[in-house]
Regions:
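Bacterial Sec-dependent N-terminal signal peptides
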Residues: 1-24, 158
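Short, small/polar residue-rich loop motifs at catalytic or cofactor-binding pockets
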Residues: 24, 47, 124-126
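Structural microenvironment flanking redox-active thiols in thiol-disulfide oxidoreductases
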Residues: 62-100, 115-117
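Short, internal strand/loop/helix patches
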Residues: 99-126
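Thiol-/selenol-based redox modules, centered on thioredoxin-like
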Residues: 125, 131-158
Length: 158
């Protein structure tokens, strides 16, 4: 009986560890348009990381991506992970419409059904963006007004 309690307590502690590091890049996973699993640890090392949680159907999200692509040269030094909760057909359509597959620093996919990223950040409104330095330390969370200009300035400082 004591052994079961101890084992349960250990499992709880270990499983909560993933959620207890809000100042680090979350250990997310998503499915890319090519059907492969992409994990946070697959992001290139030594570069700042931008995580964008979005919906292809969201007008504010579409506007954010247009602004991001207009200034993509300023963001080339960062890895950009774009994550949605919607099904893969929506992701593929969004990638095609915005020609996102031509950018080697943009990683896009769906966490369809898990909502891990949404829960991790307690996201209430889209789009959502988080900026991390090259060591994976949180620099800034953008959850109200998202400014690509501010993001660009902060990336230059890193």
């Amino acid at each position: 009986m004591i052994w079961r309690f101890f084992l349960s307590a250990m499992i709880l502690l270990i499983s909560s560890a993933a959620y207890s590091q809000p100042n680090k890049v979350p250990p997310f996973k998503m499915i890319n348009p090519d059907g492969k699993v992409f994990r946070a640890e697959n992001l290139p090392l030594g570069k700042p990381i931008v995580i964008i949680y979005f919906s292809p159907d969201c007008e504010d999200c579409q506007q954010l991506i247009k602004e991001l692509l207009n200034r993509i040269k300023e963001l080339n030094g960062a890895s950009i992970a774009m994550i949605t909760y919607l099904p893969m057909d929506k992701v593929k359509q969004f990638v095609t419409e915005n020609k996102l597959d031509k950018y080697s620093n943009i990683f896009i996919g769906t966490e369809e059904g898990s909502y891990f990223v949404s829960k991790y950040y307690k996201i209430g409104k889209l789009p959502f963006m988080a900026l991390y330095n090259k060591n994976g330390d949180l620099i800034k969370i953008y959850n109200k007004e998202i400014s690509i200009e501010d993001l660009s300035i902060r990336l230059k400082e890193l």
